[in-house]
C-alpha cells in the first residue's frame, strides 16, 4: 500500500498545481493572476514543487516530534539514568514504554536484552557485548526514519532552481523572438517575455530558498537528536556494565 502513496502524492500535487495555475486570475486577482498564468506552464511546475515541499516539511515536523516521544526527552533520559543508578532495570523499561519515540525504542531494546541475558546468567562480557549490539541494531533501525525525506527536500530545492532558470531562458527567448519577428521594438511583447523570465526566476528562488532553509533546520534537529541518543546509549551501557559487575 505504501508504495502507491508517493506516486499518488505526486499525481495529486500535479493536478492541484495545474488547476491553481489555470484558474490563477480567478484565485489571486485579475492583474496578479494574469501575470502568473502568462508566465507559462513552468509556473505550474513550480507550484507543484512548492506543494510537495510543504508536504515534506509537515511530514518531517510531525515525524520528528513523534520521534522525541510523549514527554520531554532530556527529562526522560534523566529518569532512566536514575532508575539504572538504583539498579531498577524493570522500572527503566517501563519508562521507555511510557515515553515511546526513537530514543525510548533504542533504550528499551538494550534494556530488554540485558534483562534476558541476566536471567540466563550469561557471562559479563557476553551481557555487555550483546546489550551494546542490541542498542546499535535498534539505533540503526531508527536513524533512517529520522532522516527520511530529507533528500527529497534537498532535491526539490535544486530542481526548483533549474526550473526557474529554464523559465528565465524561455522568457528571454520569447522577448528576442518578438524583436526578430517585428523588426522593431514592440514594448508590449518585449515586456511579456521579460515578465515571464522574472516571474519564473522569482518562483524558482523562493522554492529553493525555502527548501534549503528547512533542509538545514531538519538536518540540525536530526544531528542533535542522534547526538543526544548516542550519548544516552553510551551512558546506559556503562551503567549496565557496572551493574553486571556488581552482581557478580
Please describe what each predicted stretch is.
Residues 40, 54, 92, 107, ...:
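Residue-level signature of catalytic and energy-coupling elements of molecular machines
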Residues 4, 17-35, 143-221:
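Helix-termination/interfacial motifs at the ends of transmembrane alpha-helices
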Residues 1-75, 218:
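Hydrophobic membrane-targeting segments
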Residues 62-63, 68-160, 177, 182, ...:
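Predominantly long cytosolic amphipathic alpha-helical stalk/bundle segments
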Residues 50, 57, 106, 168-171:
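Amphipathic, well-ordered alpha-helical segments in soluble domains
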